[in-house]
A protein has these predicted regions:
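Walker A (P-loop) phosphate-binding loop of P-loop NTPases
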Residues: 2
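Walker A/P-loop
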Residues: 6
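NTP-dependent small-molecule kinase module
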Residues: 15, 101, 131-168
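ATP-dependent small-molecule kinase phosphotransfer cores
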Residues: 22-84, 127
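Short, well-ordered alpha-helix to beta-strand connector turns
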Residues: 62, 86-87, 140-141
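Short glycine-rich anion-binding loops that position phosphate/pyrophosphate groups of nucleotides
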Residues: 71-73, 95-97, 150
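A glycine- and Lys/Arg-enriched "phosphate-lid" helix/loop adjacent to the NTP-binding pocket
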Residues: 85-134
Length: 168
């Protein structure tokens, strides 16, 4: 959440000539309602069930693509297994300061960060989420890339280079 997955994904997809899919946007199109509304009406557990089913559909139907997942997608064991076994997963690893900066400057609509928190509260909340998710991200990813201090174009080039190494 807040590491630039969608921005980096769009750049990467252009460089690779693949389509780009943001899973949250795909879900909104399929469901006819916003992620926030799904969270409100179905709760987080309900959203995660919808998200995991959508992930399976996208992986099955869409072919070559760059797919941006929500920060909590991999909290579902089924989703994490699917991603690890059927895709090449890149963990864009950012420190708390980078995430707080990005989320403060480009807040978006993020149900997991409701209440428009101040930077201290945001930093604490991001730390909590990172500690809950870090091990799953690490186990699921085929590539772990530290992105602190790097521009998105550089990150996309590094992903391409690392993916080529995996292919050799």
């Amino acid at each position: 959440m807040g590491c630039g997955k969608s921005c980096i994904g769009k750049i990467l997809s252009e460089k690779l000539g693949f389509k780009f899919i943001d899973l949250d946007i795909w879900i909104e199109g399929q469901e006819g309602r916003s992620v926030r509304r799904i969270f409100t009406e179905n709760g987080e557990a309900g959203f995660r069930r919808i998200e995991t089913a959508a992930l399976g559909e996208v992986i099955e139907e869409e072919g070559d693509m760059v797919l941006a997942l929500g920060g909590g997608t991999l909290t579902s064991a089924a989703a994490a297994t699917m991603v690890h076994e059927r895709t090449r997963c890149v963990y864009l690893k950012a420190g708390i300061d980078t995430l707080v900066f990005n989320l403060t400057n480009w807040p978006g609509d993020r149900p997991m960060l409701d209440g428009n928190p101040d930077s201290k509260t945001l930093s604490r909340r991001i730390g909590e989420l990172m500690s809950q998710r870090e091990s799953t991200y690490g186990r699921t990813a085929h590539i772990i890339l530290d992105i602190d201090g790097k521009d998105y174009d550089t990150v996309s080039d590094e992903i391409i280079a690392l993916a080529h190494i995996l292919d050799s």
